[in-house]
Structure formats: C-alpha cells, structure tokens
Amino acid sequence: VPTTDGLYLGLISGTSADGIDAALVRFEAGHPSLVAGLTHPWDDTLRRRILAVAQDEDRLALDDYGRLDVAVAHAFTDAARAVLDKAKVSHTAVTAIGSHGQTIRHRPDGPLPFTLQIGDPSVIAERSGIDTVADFRRADVAAGGQGAPLVPAFHATVLRPENGARVVLNLGGIANVTRLSAGGDVTGFDTGPANGLMDAWCLRHRGEAFDRDGRFAASGRIDAALLAELLDDAYFVLPPPKSTGREHFHLAWLDTHPRVADNTPEDVQATLLALSAVSIADAIERYAGDASDVVACGGGVHNAALIRALAERLPGRELVTSSVFGIDPDFMEAMAFAWLAYRRLRGEPGNLASVTGARGPRLLGALYAAP
C-alpha cells in the first residue's frame, strides 16, 4: 500500500448550504492535522437556487441542472484556492482534493435508491490543477447502504476513546451521532434536524441565514403541543441505520402542522430548537446510553441556546466540543472528506457497514485527474 502521506484538501457544503467548508489537512503516518480551514461564502443568488432545488420548490429543467452542477464546481474551486492562499501553499503541493459536493437529493430507501451531489469534479480538477476525488456516497448506496453518515469512520480514527464509550455529535443542518467504544463496532446515524429547520425559519422571518447564538429562539417560548406533533414524525422512531436530509425536514413539512400558524415566529423558533435538542438527546439515550461524554462539532456548536438545551437534556454526561481534542469543530466534516480522499488513493474502504447498513466495506469516490 502506498504511503500517500502529504497534503489533502477537503471540501463540503452541508444541507444548510451556509458556505463551503475547506480544510487543508496534512497526513503524517496516517494521522491527520489541520493546516488551515475557512468557510467560503456562497453567492447569494446561487445559494437560494440550491436551497430551492433541495427543498423541491424549484423543479430543475435538465439545462438548468447542468449549469448548476458547473456553477457549484466553480464555487468549490474558489473555496479551494482561498484556503491555499490563506495557508500560502501552492496547488502543486497538494496530493488530492476530496470534494463532497452539494447534496440536492438523498433518497436511500425504496426500490431504486439514490443520492445526488452536484459540483462537477472534472471542472474542479481542471480549474484547481489538483487531482480530485468525488462522488463518495453512491458506492455505499449501490451496496445497499444509506450512503450516510460517512463521517463516523473519520470520528473513529481521531476520537475513539481509550476505554468506555463516547458519542460524537455533528450539528450541521441535520444532526448525526456516532457511538465509539474502545473495542467493538462503530455505530452512527442521522437523528433528524439540528440547524437546518431553524436556519430556514430564521431566513423566512428575519432574512438572516442563521440564528446567531440562538437569540431568536431564546426570545420565544416552546409550544409543548406543537413540539409533540413534530416529534410524532415517523422518522424519529425508525431504528438505525437511517439517514435523512432537507428533502424531509424542510419548511413545507413544518407548514403541514396547523399549530405553526397559531404561534409567533419566535415561539416556533424556540419550539424548533427544542425539537432538535429533544430528538438528539432521545437518540443518544436510546442508542448510546453507556456513553460518558458527548463531543460536539459542526456549526451548531456556536448556537449557545442549542448547546444549553442539549446539556440540560443530557444530565450526567460531559458535553464538550471537539476543540478539546485539538480538532476545530467547524472543519471536522471537511477534514473527513480530505481523509476519504486519502483512503481512496491508498485503495482502502471509506464506509462503515455498521453505520450505513451497506453489504460490506467499499472503496468510496472516483478519481478525476488534473491536467
């Protein structure tokens, strides 16, 4: 197996499309460390288009799909260039880019399961001059898996405890949990919404992309009856392996609940925050009840109200962010896709069947050569 140590660049935009996270990662003897990270902003028009498509408010004609695929690739390349500029590193020093792309549809269940990420990797490889690994999820779906979450395999590499059990909690648009133990299988799944619904509600009522520090939610009161209705969704009682996304938990789903219209915007936001906290805490209690600590990462770590609500609902467990372990919580996922590119070039599988439900380990991603 080639060593393939060196510099890799991970790129991802999550379900909230709140920016493209770029992480420049150095691998030494297989151990990853962050050299530089940044979040590259979306052009506002492009972001709104992505969200409209992901929420099925915009039925794309094929020509529009093709153009959006390339526009996203241009934005991803700009993010890659920006993080290289920040680190003062030449593109020639980077072994490969691992590009997750932008998910616009995730349907891993049913007779013809699929997952769809855009951001043409041929364009990224051509414009960046760096070999690019992309299309990480579809091999797992083809093997009967959910294609998500993929980050637990990386969590197991960098955060496995020396004894006992630990939960890694990723607070993106969607929340996912990973249960790690000193020995034994890694398990993980999407619990439901984290920031995605709150972000969308905040954009609708405040014109802001996210609820800074959770202040909008903190200004409202939880409607217990509405919360119970939202928690009644069938997804919350599905056993793992399971994954979800914006095509399920979006504003149109929220609007199907009549009590929403009876509440003030801030009371709905407070209730959405409670939905995230309760569904996450319930999932941890049910499937990782033996974990003594919860390590949080993702954009949601900056929502002080959400972190407080989680701490209240996880008594007896230490809730910390991944920065305690030297991993920037904002770039855990981008680092994971740099790691997946590293795995691909080494010819090593990137999925965990115990997490995704796939028939077995699979090589993830395809390689797009730079000129």
Give the predicted meaning of each segment:
Residues 57-119:
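Short beta-strand-loop/turn "lid" adjacent to the catalytic site in phosphate-handling enzymes
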Residues 5, 19-43, 187-277, 281, ...:
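Conserved ATP-utilizing enzyme core subdomain
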Residues 13, 17, 274, 323-370:
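Glycine-rich phosphate-binding/hydrolytic loop that grips phosphoryl groups
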Residues 2-5, 90-93, 162-164, 288-292:
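Short helix-loop-beta connector
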Residues 291-313:
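Glycine-rich phosphate-binding loops at beta-strand->alpha-helix junctions
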Residues 2, 91, 268, 283, ...:
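Non-transmembrane, aqueous-exposed alpha-helical and coiled segments at domain scale
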Residues 2-40, 165-182:
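Gly/Thr-rich phosphate-binding beta-strand-loop-beta motif of the actin/hexokinase/Hsp70
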Residues 4-7, 108, 112-115, 126, ...:
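Phosphate-binding/catalytic loop of phosphoryl-transfer enzymes
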